[in-house]
Amino acid sequence: MTNVSADSILGALLGTAVGDALGMPIEGLSHQNVRTYYKGIKEYRDDDQRGDLSAGQWTDDTQMTFALVRVLTKFPDRPAAWPSAAVEEYVRLRSEARRWGNTTTTAIDRLAGGTSPAESGVPDRATDGAAMRAAPLGIWWATQDVDRDDAFEAVRPVLAVTHRHPVALVAGWGQAAAVHTLLAQSPDTFERAAFWDAMLEAATWAEAQLDATDRVSSRLQNLTDRLDAFPLDLRDACDGVGVRAEEAWPFACAMVARRAHLLENTLLSGINVGGDADTTGAMMGAMLGALHGWAAFPSEWQKGLEAADRLSEEARGLSEVLG
């Protein structure tokens, strides 16, 4: 159990939303098209191509993350209640869905039709939707007196409500473990090698628990000696930065490990690689926020974020009940 500051918790949660909003306009674009259409992302921008969202607005990454914030705030001591509570939150959000991925949409449609949360998750799509929403679970783990086995038994079922593929769950567990690890550190105490070893160990352990292939841990291993490489080279080492869990999450981890002390530079550099940029942005934002705290984010990012007051209130509510 770690003595976690409220600012660090806000950093992990609101950092998710900031990264999501920065990446929103270029979601799905190649790096070349990011350069062509946007000349690179340096601030919140309207989505000029799709025209559906404006500068500072966020997508499903933030919707799903804060759905879990509300679940954990309501049931901080009852992980067994989380899957059913998540169902209520997810189904309620259907009318407000923002760019939900196919995996999430399929699962929540099943839930709305009466499928149980134990069976609703999609078992054959190894996408990154579990990882994108895992920050609140890492916060919960960091603030509770639970060991790794108990934390895993709490985290896995609620992520599996939408994503049951073992590789998706490995990445989801990895993101929770990353936030858990970084909440115990600061930019001054961060050690890259120790962080990377922890991420590789977390992925390898989860793969064993889930009887999963080594698609996540092998990507991390492939990145081990390349953490000073350029972002585009890290992308290539991951075989891309699309929606596959074994691409997006290892890339986000590598970007944070590469320059963890540079919050703004790291987040923008990773997002501008393109691909599933709102989700890699959300995951990087959560990790960097856990390490640096919310106060370290640029004021224009704080003020320009959609519904910042509501998100801050919900994040503070979780911080208080976990206190």
Protein language model regions, located:
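Structured, active/binding-site neighborhoods that engage oxygen-rich ligands
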Residues: 1-323
